[in-house]
Amino acid sequence: MVPLSFPFHVAELEVGQHLYWQIGNLNLHGQVFISSWVVISALLVLVITGTRKMERDPQGVQNLLEFLWDYLRDLAREQIGEKAYRDWLPFIGTLFLFIFGCNWGGALVPWKLIELPNGELGAPTADINTTVAMALLVSLSYFYAGLSRKGLRYFEYYVEPTPIMLPFKIIEDFTKPLSLSFRLFGNILADELVVGVLAFLVPILVPLPAMFLGLFTSAIQALIFATLAANYIGEAVHEEHH
């Protein structure tokens, strides 16, 4: 727990408290699961509402979903390639929507109104466990993509154009999930802390610009994560890279 205190008890903000769920020998961060389920439920409601009565002339939620589908399809096609992007479009789209929902949910939903025995609710992506799990999932995905498309020939990538590159390619495989996870975690946590501190110090109007900037940053971070995930998968399946 890292306390942030201010003189004369003007404000106090604590970071690092968690609601733990004990399952066997495992300690799970309960507030992350709760807020994640809220985001997933909201996304399911959005998708069901937009696809329940499909119309040839889309309007409302259907129009929004079709716009997102077209945008993510173009992103996946550009990064992965024409031959393989269809297999990975649902994965890339799910990543983007979940991260976007988590980021915006952390900024817009009044989580502090929900009292917990310990800790407080917030954006799931402001917890390092969430971002590391998604980054490792991306790593497993591009390994699977390369092996399923090329078989053992995939490992030729590690010794091309010369075997001297082998240790550097291995290090790169470790740095990819690290950069993905810490970039997303750091940006979302920093945004929550900045808005939280400003809200404690000057609760009227002043935090609004920081909150709007946080919404923009949150959307960009979701796009960056999805784009890099698609790019890594594209590198694994493209013949010219191996």
UniProtKB/Swiss-Prot annotation:
One of its GO terms (cellular component) is proton-transporting ATP synthase complex. GO terms for molecular function: proton transmembrane transporter activity. Gene3D superfamilies: ATP synthase, F0 complex, subunit A. Keywords: ATP synthesis, CF(0), Hydrogen ion transport, Ion transport, Membrane, Organellar chromatophore, Plastid, Thylakoid, Transmembrane, Transmembrane helix, Transport. Its main location: plastid. It holds the Pfam family ATP-synt_A. NCBIfam families: ATP_synt_6_or_A. Belongs to the ATPase A chain family. Key component of the proton channel; it plays a direct role in the translocation of protons across the membrane. F-type ATPases have 2 components, CF(1) - the catalytic core - and CF(0) - the membrane proton channel. CF(1) has five subunits: alpha(3), beta(3), gamma(1), delta(1), epsilon(1). CF(0) has four main subunits: a, b, b' and c. This is ATP synthase subunit a, organellar chromatophore. It comes from Paulinella chromatophora. The gene is atpI.
